[in-house]
């Protein structure tokens, strides 16, 4: 009787762990499908870098502190480059 009970509890625990791992794997695969390809991310980074540098150069010529207005959405301008905050 004890052996049967232990076997049932063990099988139930393995089933729960397997189901949890499968759900995590499915969630990760869905996140990967939604994200942008690396080439698009690189283009966005280059665009942010250019906007920040151009904005900074314009403000420096006017003898103003370099307050970046182009770096938004979790980015800030530092040393003429947009960096992730």
Curated annotation (Swiss-Prot):
Tissue note: Expressed by the venom gland.
CC annotations in GO: extracellular region; host cell postsynaptic membrane
Disulfide topology: 52-66, 56-77, 71-82
Keywords assigned by UniProt, alphabetized: Disulfide bond, Neurotoxin, Postsynaptic neurotoxin, Secreted, Signal, Toxin
InterPro entries on file: Hwtx-2-like
Superkingdom, natural source: Eukaryota
Cellular location(s): Secreted
Record's keyword annotation contains Disulfide bond: yes
GO molecular function terms attached to this record: toxin activity
Signal peptide positions (record): 1-22
Keyword Phosphoprotein: no
Similarity comment: Belongs to the neurotoxin 12 (Hwtx-2) family. 02 (Hwtx-2) subfamily.
UniProt function note: Postsynaptic neurotoxin.
UniProt name for this protein: U4-theraphotoxin-Hhn1c
Annotated organism of origin: Cyriopagopus hainanus (Chinese bird spider)
């Amino acid at each position: 009787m004890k052996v049967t009970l232990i076997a049932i509890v063990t099988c139930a625990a393995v089933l729960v762990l397997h189901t949890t791992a499968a759900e995590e794997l499915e969630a990760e695969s869905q996140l990967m499908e939604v994200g942008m390809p690396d080439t698009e991310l690189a283009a966005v980074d280059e665009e942010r870098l250019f906007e920040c540098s151009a904005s900074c150069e314009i403000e420096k010529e006017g003898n103003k502190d370099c307050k970046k207005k182009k770096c938004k959405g979790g980015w800030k301008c530092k040393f003429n480059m947009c960096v992730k905050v």
